[in-house]
Amino acid sequence: IFLAERGFEVAIHYHSSESSADKLVEYIKSKTGKNSVALRADLTKEVEVRELITRASEKLGGPISCLINNASIFEYDNIWTANRESWDRHIESNLRAPLVLTQSFANQVPSIISDDNGEPVSQGLIINLIDQRVKKLTPEFTSYTIAKMGLWALTQTSAQALAPNIRVNAIGPGPTLKGARQSEEHFENQRKNTVLGRGSDPSEIVAAVGYLLNAKSVTGQLICVDGGQHLAWKTPDVLGVE
């Protein structure tokens, strides 16, 4: 909705939530007057991933200028329980799919232009939704964390490889929405125990997207919108030391 309000035509990817995606498309069309389409794909199947950018471009009638890699599998495992299935599901959805989409996106972005000062202006922007935990590692969610660490590396290396015509950045949310398997008490404790004593809200994630859309000189960066969760330092090895 935010992107449509800023003048973008929007392609929405979904896997199983067809009804919700269709409702969002109709809302965007009715409230903003911008074109929008919903496209189904299983991001663990590369053949479906490879077609997404082309399908979106054809449906919207032109090249795609902004790619937001937001879809993610987030399931618990640890060093003892991680197996081939959990590894593949997390790597395929959180790392392989963004790589393939990045490749497809880069192949269709219009040629670079220059501003009035003769300096190049990027014509494409990729935003990868990562996780603040790449800045604050724990032994929990092993496959997920490794996949997101890989996506952070991909963000930086693709920013190098695709410059100057495409900028690539990342956003690392903290406790924003309660997880499906998370208790209300645990979620509230997560939020209040950040450095700022508060979590983030969806509107703040959107604000970070807005900043990256406008910041023509920013690439290869990670913005943690997490209440400072990644800076948490009150651990047993520090507390009580004078």
Where are these regions (language model features)?
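The beta1-alpha1 cofactor-binding region of Rossmann-like NAD(H)/NADP(H)-dependent oxidoreductases
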Residues: 18-19, 40-53, 84, 203
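A short, exposed helix-loop element centered on a Lys and neighboring polar residues
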Residues: 102-103, 156
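Substrate-binding pocket helix/loop in short-chain dehydrogenase/reductase
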Residues: 78-79, 83-91, 190
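Conserved Rossmann-fold SDR core element
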Residues: 63, 152, 162-176, 218-225
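Canonical Rossmann dinucleotide-binding motif of NAD(H)/NADP(H)-dependent dehydrogenases/reductases
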Residues: 1-11
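C-terminal substrate-recognition "lid" of short-chain dehydrogenase/reductases
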Residues: 201-225, 230-231
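Catalytic loop of short-chain dehydrogenase/reductase
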Residues: 73, 113-163, 175-176, 229
